[in-house]
Amino acid sequence: MPTANPTPAGLASPPFCEEDYLRFSRLVAERFGLFFPEKRRNELEFGVRQAFLASTCPDFNSYFAVLNDSENGPLELERLVNHLTIGETHFFRDSGQFDALANYVLPGIIIRRRTTRTIRIWSAGCASGEEPYSIAMLLRDLVPDIDSWTIMIYGTDVNTRYLEWAKRGVYGQRSFREARAFTYRDRFFKQVNNQYHLHPSIRRMVTFGQLNLAEDRYPSYETNTMFMDLILCRNVTIYFPESVTRRVIQRFYQSLCPGGWLVVGHSEHSLGTYQRFHTHNFPNAILYQRPLEDTPAAQERPAPPEAARLPARSGAGLSPKAAADNSKMEVRVEQRKPDPISRRYRRGRTTGLLVLPSLAVKSVPASQPANAIEEAQSLLASGHADQARDLLKRWIDQHPDDGKA
């Protein structure tokens, strides 16, 4: 197993010539989707040189050959990408996006999933874990009975070194830069000297795994990337060429359940990359949502917030005729007695914190099967096959004449 470069101490490593730049840049683009144009040449050289010095290879020619070797290549490629990727992040990074998540997106998901009590969230390119842990802390506040829910927060990164740091849940001062982060630090961290140890209750909410976004291994059950309610991939695709970014965003679209949300960084590629999504403009944030239906008509109109769908579920226990009558009624959400989540969701709509699309708030026809099917898929994805079957059976019993079921 390669451990250290035998180059004698004090001697310089080989020069990084034009040929080296071209072949190594092609290699990392093909394997990891990472784009190193001429202006980033020094970054590529530094990363390659650091990984090379950790190998047993005498020169760049032999090192390049090892990277392409079927036996030793995977280990050396892992070491190389660990030196090439940047893990700069901190808790609740980008306050505008987290305001939108805390006041609108997450409360809407919670309302929508109240029946199944399952939520699936993916932090793609999570680096050292601050982002998925931030989401976990928000959910601790937003879901009063969280222990009765099945919440899956999945953090992935191509850099295994960062993932090990994330699993430890130990952070320094630089991870706390936002005002919201200091509030949660006092509640969910224990200070030990100059480090902050995350509370086990938050660490248990997040699982981590290695995933190369440039590969086509997702969405799949194998990678646990199906039926997501929310995907965050911020400041990751800025290192990809546009062609790779388009493929990644298309896979994210397929990984999301209908109505699921995508959060990307402000500097990501935007040349039509997100045209299949609904675009939602919030103060200091733009978020994307997969339409509830993949039809041209659905793509032309804004997707309603999930609170508007609550009245349809109020007819779940009614007879088919009563449920059908209920589906024709126009319902104002404000007339319903709000629980804490609904109040928080509505507060975001009325205090000027958020800018929502113009909506006609009506209940969804009770004969529409998409909601039940979507929830059943979510249950299946989280291992609750019996609950999924029971949910669909109840829907069929209530809608015996609907052939779509």
Question: PLM ranges: what are they?
Answer:
Residues 246-258:
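A short glycine-rich, Lys/Arg-flanked "PGG" loop and its adjoining helix->strand segment in the class I
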Residues 258-266:
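Conserved beta-strand signature within the Rossmann-like core of class I S-adenosyl-L-methionine
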Residues 2-122:
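Conserved AdoMet
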Residues 278-328, 333:
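Core SAM-dependent methyltransferase catalytic element
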Residues 361-401:
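Alpha-helical segment of the N-proximal tetratricopeptide repeat
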Residues 124, 145-232, 236-244:
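Extended basic-aromatic, gly/pro-enriched interface segments that bind polyanionic ligands
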Residues 128-146:
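Conserved SAM-binding loop of SAM-dependent methyltransferases across substrates and taxa
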